[in-house]
């Protein structure tokens, strides 16, 4: 073998080895923005309105450092915190907590539309860029026909904030009414698949079909894992039909990930909650999985790039 042949064969071998390494290299893990966590501290002087003392699972301090431990090495780079208190002052409590916790990339607060102080409170909290919207319960959303309620909801839209709706299957029709009233408002429906899904998903399909056609309505898939007669069902295949239906109805651009921690602890460890949906999206292409785990939430909430989430997608 001549020196030229040797150099050529060595170079070819190096190229082949590099290609082999590239082909077999494990792809980088998908970054995750968890769009549904609750943080609170029952030990503070004023206590908390929720959870109750009788809740042995949830009545304990739950803060960002605790969430980080539960996430382990799942590559959760940030979270959108969702209100867990009816107290107006707790909106500021979470915003203050976020100042020293860059893992919080957004906060969905709580104010009751129709109250005289709503507008002033909304402006005050919305001055903080981490305040990304409000969560509205079914008891408030069904009052959408009241002029004061409708006017307050329009204020949310005018500030380019979003609204989460909460209430299971009963919230679908009021959410549809809200979307018709304010078609430019970004709406996130919490906690699919609802508990009612297990009994009769077909009953919800007409409303879901209509909501799925509305471009600013997102489905938060954050209530997947179940227990039946106390036994945990952790086989991802069990949940595939529901996930397939939701992704079919809302499309790949309008489904978002939520872990619902620490409420999820009532059912399963956080790693299990994540694994069930991760298994489903592993069967899709990477672009679709990225949309679910972080890209779509950026469109829905317009969360703030900070901390580990500062360079996501760059």
Regions found by a protein language model. Give the residues of each.
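Active-site metal-binding loops of divalent metal-dependent hydrolases
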Residues: 37, 84, 192, 260-261
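Short beta-strand segments
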Residues: 80-83, 109, 220, 256-258, ...
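Short, small-residue-enriched loops and turns at beta-alpha junctions
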Residues: 86-87, 113-116, 140-144, 194-197, ...
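Short, electropositive alpha-helical surface patch
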Residues: 89-103, 242, 270-280
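Catalytic pocket-lining loop regions of alpha/beta-barrel enzymes
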Residues: 143-256, 305-313
